[in-house]
């Protein structure tokens, strides 16, 4: 009952401080994160729920993102577009970890199912849990103190009294002008209240906070009511046993074919470099090399991970260790090639917010490629480590003043004569005019 009631002001503060932060633009997000963490932790302790070992990591990442917002605002470029969803994702993951609702007991390869449970199954499956909890507590309290008959008697008494007073007021207003004027004053006050913009604004926030609070309490309360996650690792393993339809020969043939294509690609790349090395590359040719195919290389890495995941979940047998090592080695090579392209391009054309984002994407995929290669020889929780690397690196990047860093680098290159002119589009995107005015 207590936690159900506390969710009402907490949801209202989320609307005013996070979703529509006009009232608390600087500190609403970190304050809500701190209050919600305390709320979840106290509720979990009251339910005697053991937290996952990774819970502090998600708490730190979530709070760091919350604190970074009032310091630097949203980062420019795609990175800023991802901050808002990431902040909510970390919040949901913290709740799941603290309440013991992760499918594997920890983050891992079933993370998509955890996201489905955290955003859909638990909150919407328990959407009316708060209302039921409050009404049940009130009904029990009233029954214990007055009994059902007395409650009904009070309701009937109040209705009859209001009806009689209304009739009497109308008759007396017709009998005396001053009494009628008093009634008109009360009516005018009520109309002014209902037509007051501030009152309507507060009322709308209160009404909007009701479904928000129902969702939040459904997530927390629904997690604490369950003894096991909506989908467990054992259930997934049992289902996947019936889905292992890919023969080993098919998997081996497909991976060997991909390795052949990759080997041919690197042979062509090496031939191009050997042919061009004696002649040298001018700046336009170097820039063309750097920019061409960067995102395609990242897509190749994603393709490799999809192939490995498909074999892991749907293959009847794992790949031979040597073939798996070669395939994962190509992934590391693609990541290294993409890193070289990005480094050359940044050296030639300076930093932009999008290149910061590209560097982060490349870093995460490179870490995944290395973990996949290590996992061939040593059983490590590669998916868990990859998720941690993505979350921590994204948080650290959001805690850096990317806007000022981009401005400083571009101005330094211009003053040193490296760039003939400033890229005003990039500078304006990073708020250079505002910085100069200050």
Task: Say what each PLM segment does.
Residues 395-420:
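Hydrophobic alpha-helical transmembrane segments in integral membrane proteins
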Residues 190-207, 282-302, 351-361:
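Short aromatic-rich membrane-water interface segments that cap or initiate transmembrane helices
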Residues 15-23, 27-181, 204-227:
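Transmembrane-helix bundle segments that line or gate the permeation/cavity pathway
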Residues 170-187, 264-280, 336-344:
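Membrane-helix interface motif
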Residues 326-376:
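Membrane-embedded alpha-helical segments of integral membrane proteins
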Residues 83-88, 199-238, 242, 251, ...:
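Terminal, non-globular segments
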Residues 149-155, 317-322, 377-391:
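Membrane-interfacial entry segments at the cytosolic side of transmembrane helices
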Residues 259, 380-403:
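Internal/C-terminal transmembrane anchor helices
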